[in-house]
């Protein structure tokens, strides 16, 4: 029972923070969808492109967690601050690289087969989110440091505050309240940028100007950037980034295929992504402490508790899958109407709930054992597994079901269970082999 208790103690603040992200996603989709269906469709496409970049960057920042977790497990707190400094530097360089890549995508957005009427809505929203990318990566660096030392509450409160700020900003700027102009989708982007800047500033103030992290601040301030640490972070971070990036690409690239079907399908796809965030973020919230606990026990060379922590995490994932998916299934005919005034969107959302329910087991399985593998720093094989599961299975299956079998958007979504479950099984087999 100690493992379940420890995972819940670490995980619940992360889950609460992620619920804040979910509420923000719901609020964004609700407010944009009721302002304009075209804006909802434009937001769907742009958000999918940025989700790919942000998840890739988040995966890279995860390279810090097993390092900090192992150092913390051994009591080497003096090294942790130095690792954070190198992590923030590495994240900044990655932000520059991703910004250049996304800028190239922006210049070619008209070549991606999206509806012409959506392009004037997509472009300004895209630029504002592009500016915010650096702040996402800096926050990730601070958050993974805090998670690695088992201090998950600070991130929770900052995330919740940022989300409240974003929702209020959305309401004011999308609809033009309190004397502000009615900006629609662009207003949602500006609100997102402001909240992301605020979250980084608050975390930096807590780290540098309070005593909460003073033992780590000394290592941060009194050590220069270190080539060995930088390379170590990259060695762990890039495979995780590739693994998470390919997983997200199976959704983001699917959005391009959905765009070929039309504006209604894109709007339904965005609604389903907002709904799917409920279970995904809860899995993520409980998966992060699996990586932390596993890395702590790995630092102590305690293989038995490494395994017990991972399997306890999987049991929790199964429980979350049940309590998360059941109410969504029961409300499937009502959910679409919460997000859009279009009856066609509502009908399509109800149909997409079925493949969504099917892939919950595979999603929980792959998130849990991906985090367990991160905790033991066995990350390179995950990259190859992700390529097989998402690029060789999920994306081709989506095209086959969606267009060759002519199932449309339902066919595209029916491919996700195949990719996620394949990844989950292969991650489990790898972890089981590593820890025998």
Where is each model-derived feature located?
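Helix-terminus/linker motif at the lipid-water interface of multi-pass membrane proteins
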Residues: 19, 23-41, 109-116, 172-185, ...
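Short alpha-helical transmembrane segments in multi-pass integral membrane proteins
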Residues: 1-14, 68-134, 180-238, 294-359, ...
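Transmembrane alpha-helix boundary and packing residues in multipass membrane permease domains
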Residues: 14, 18, 29-30, 66, ...
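Short runs within selected transmembrane alpha-helices of multi-pass transporters and secretion channels
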Residues: 61, 129-147, 155-163, 188-203, ...
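Small-residue hotspots at the loop-to-helix junctions and early N-terminal turns
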Residues: 37-48, 122, 126, 189, ...
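Small-residue-rich hydrophobic transmembrane alpha-helices
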Residues: 40-103, 136-155, 255, 268-330, ...
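Transmembrane helical elements of multi-pass membrane transporters/channels
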Residues: 9-28, 128, 139, 162, ...
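N-terminal transmembrane alpha-helices
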Residues: 2-30, 34-35, 51-63, 67, ...
């Amino acid at each position: 029972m100690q493992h379940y208790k420890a995972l819940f103690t670490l995980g619940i603040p992360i889950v609460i923070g992620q619920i804040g992200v979910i509420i923000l996603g719901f609020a964004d989709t609700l407010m944009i969808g009721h302002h304009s269906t075209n804006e909802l469709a434009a937001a769907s496409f742009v958000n999918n492109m940025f989700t790919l970049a942000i998840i890739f960057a988040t995966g890279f920042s995860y390279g810090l967690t097993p390092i900090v977790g192992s150092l913390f497990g051994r009591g080497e707190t003096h090294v942790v601050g130095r690792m954070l400094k190198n992590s923030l530097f590495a994240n900044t360089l990655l932000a520059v690289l991703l910004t250049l890549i996304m800028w190239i995508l922006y210049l070619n957005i008209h070549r991606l087969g999206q509806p012409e009427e959506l392009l004037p809505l997509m472009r300004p929203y895209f630029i504002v989110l592009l500016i915010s990318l650096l702040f996402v990566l800096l926050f990730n660096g601070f958050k993974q440091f805090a998670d690695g030392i088992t201090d998950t509450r600070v991130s929770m409160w900052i995330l919740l505050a940022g989300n409240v700020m974003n929702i209020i900003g959305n309401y004011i700027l999308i609809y033009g309240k309190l004397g502000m102009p009615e900006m629609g989708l662009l207003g949602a982007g500006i609100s997102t940028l402001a909240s992301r800047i605020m979250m980084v500033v608050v975390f930096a103030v807590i780290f540098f100007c309070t005593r909460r992290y003073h033992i780590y601040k000394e290592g941060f301030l009194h050590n220069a950037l270190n080539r060995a640490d930088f390379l170590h972070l990259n060695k762990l971070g890039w495979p995780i980034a590739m693994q998470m990036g390919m997983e997200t690409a199976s959704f983001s690239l699917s959005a391009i295929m959905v765009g070929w079907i039309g504006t209604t399908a894109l709007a339904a796809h965005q609604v389903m992504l907002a709904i799917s965030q409920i279970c995904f973020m809860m899995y993520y919230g409980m998966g992060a402490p699996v990586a932390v606990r596993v890395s702590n026990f790995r630092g102590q060379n305690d293989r038995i508790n490494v395994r017990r922590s991972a399997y306890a995490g999987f049991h929790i994932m199964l429980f979350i899958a049940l309590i998360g998916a059941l109410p969504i299934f029961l409300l499937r005919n009502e959910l679409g109407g919460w997000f859009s005034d279009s009856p066609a969107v509502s009908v399509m959302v109800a149909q997409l709930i079925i493949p969504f329910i099917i892939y919950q087991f595979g999603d929980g399985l792959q998130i849990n054992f991906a985090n367990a593998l991160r905790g033991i720093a066995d990350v390179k094989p995950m990259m190859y597994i992700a390529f097989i599961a998402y690029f060789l299975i999920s994306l081709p299956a989506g095209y086959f079901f969606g267009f060759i079998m002519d199932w449309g958007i339902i066919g595209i979504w029916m491919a996700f269970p195949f990719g996620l479950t394949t990844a989950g099984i292969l991650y489990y087999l790898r972890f089981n082999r590593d820890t025998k």
